[in-house]
Curated annotation (Swiss-Prot):
Residues 208-343 are annotated as: Interaction with RSPH9. One of its GO terms (biological process) is flagellated sperm motility. It is linked to Spermatogenic failure 92: An autosomal recessive, male infertility disorder characterized by asthenozoospermia and defects of the radial spokes and doublet microtubules of sperm flagellum observed by ultrastructural analysis. Expressed in spermatozoa. The gene is LRRC23. Disulfide bonds: none annotated. The lineage of its organism: Eukaryota, Metazoa, Chordata, Craniata, Vertebrata. This is Leucine-rich repeat-containing protein 23. It comes from Homo sapiens.
Length: 343
């Protein structure tokens, strides 16, 4: 089986879409680092050994030429590893799980040019930078100490997980190189801006639990279907545009939107069907549900509840009345030009 054939059989164990949130959101997978927990300063050197490799290798497959076989899957989780230099010799690996160790350096992975799937969660990495890996589809670096998004340029990368790191700003994600990237997970970082996420192929973007105050730089994401902004500090709904024509699910729970008038800024999203605004000050207004439907007639669900036909009919009446009132307003009188003076 060639690497091209194997692309369809890679093992994406991360969800591409956000589940509905009836309760406080639970993290996908284990929390490798509890809130406030610090990493120990030093660990005893623990290199990856041949014995560990024998225990962790599985999935025997044909190599590229079809004449030989090699194990292509490796799992060496929770081994207190500080060094994976030995991986340089295992060039046929396609699936690698090195999570829950104490790794600070991923450079040996640069030799794994057949790699399709990588999970390096819960280590001590400060960067996700690696050489360009031509077949890598899924990469997860959750719960490390990563501070930037530089050096990620794998052309077939589809899903990138950087949840639970220390990233303040997104930089270096080049849309001309990341031509297949459709899902980016940046939940639980320290992001202060949404600038730098200029990835036109992006479909799912998770930015919950950051320090965002507004949405900016996402206006041209025409393929985006899911945008998750829960638990930030957003108080305005500016930054959305008609170009975001595929957006169906928008989660703004736990932000600071106080003015119901902000909802009007979402009416240019033609496919928006589900909006979550729980735990925002504006939800205390008695006309909250009605105002949302008046502004967004195609909305199907607000927070946990779907709209009933009676609510839709009432919103239609209000919308029609507002339209008629606007049509009856006198046009503002234009100032006369000097040469048009009546004197």
């Amino acid at each position: 089986m060639s690497d091209e054939d194997d692309l369809e059989d890679s093992e994406p164990d991360q969800d591409d879409s956000e589940k509905e949130e009836d309760e406080k959101e639970t993290e996908e997978g284990e929390d490798y680092r509890k809130e406030g927990e610090e990493f120990p300063e030093e660990w005893l050197p623990t290199p990856l050994t041949e014995d560990m490799m024998k225990e962790g290798l599985s999935l025997l497959c044909k190599t590229g030429n079809g004449l030989a076989h090699a194990y292509v899957k490796l799992e060496v989780k929770e081994r207190d590893l500080t060094d994976i230099y030995l991986l340089r010799s295992y060039i046929h690996l396609r699936y690698v799980d090195i999570s829950e160790n104490h790794l600070t350096d991923l450079s040996p992975l640069n030799y794994l040019t057949h790699l399709l799937w990588l999970k390096a969660d819960g280590n001590r990495l400060r960067s996700a930078q690696m050489n360009e890996l031509p077949y890598l589809q899924i990469a997860s670096f959750a719960y490390n100490q990563i501070t930037d998004t530089e050096g990620i340029s794998h052309p077939r990368l589809e899903t990138l997980n950087l949840k639970g790191n220390s990233i303040h700003m997104v930089t270096g994600l080049d849309p001309e190189k990341l031509i297949s990237l459709h899902t980016v997970e940046l939940r639980g970082n320290q992001l202060e801006s949404t600038l730098g996420i200029n990835l036109p192929k992006l479909k799912n973007l998770y930015l919950a639990q950051n320090m965002l105050k507004k949405v900016e730089g996402l206006e041209d994401l025409s393929n985006l279907t899911t945008l998750h902004l829960r638990d930030n500090q957003i108080d305005t709904l500016s930054g959305f545009s008609r170009e975001m024509k595929s957006l169906q699910y928008l989660n703004l729970r736990g932000n600071m939107v106080a003015n119901l008038g902000e909802l009007a800024k979402l009416r240019d999203l033609p496919k928006l069907r589900a909006l979550v605004l729980l735990d925002n000050p504006c939800t205390d207004e008695t006309s909250y549900r009605q105002e949302a439907l008046v502004q967004m007639p195609y909305l199907e669900r607000l927070d946990k509840e779907f709209y009933e036909e009676e609510e839709r009919a009432e919103a239609d009446v209000i919308r029609q009345r507002l339209k008629e009132e606007k049509e009856q307003e006198p046009e503002p009188q234009r100032d006369l030009e000097p040469e048009q003076s009546l004197i």
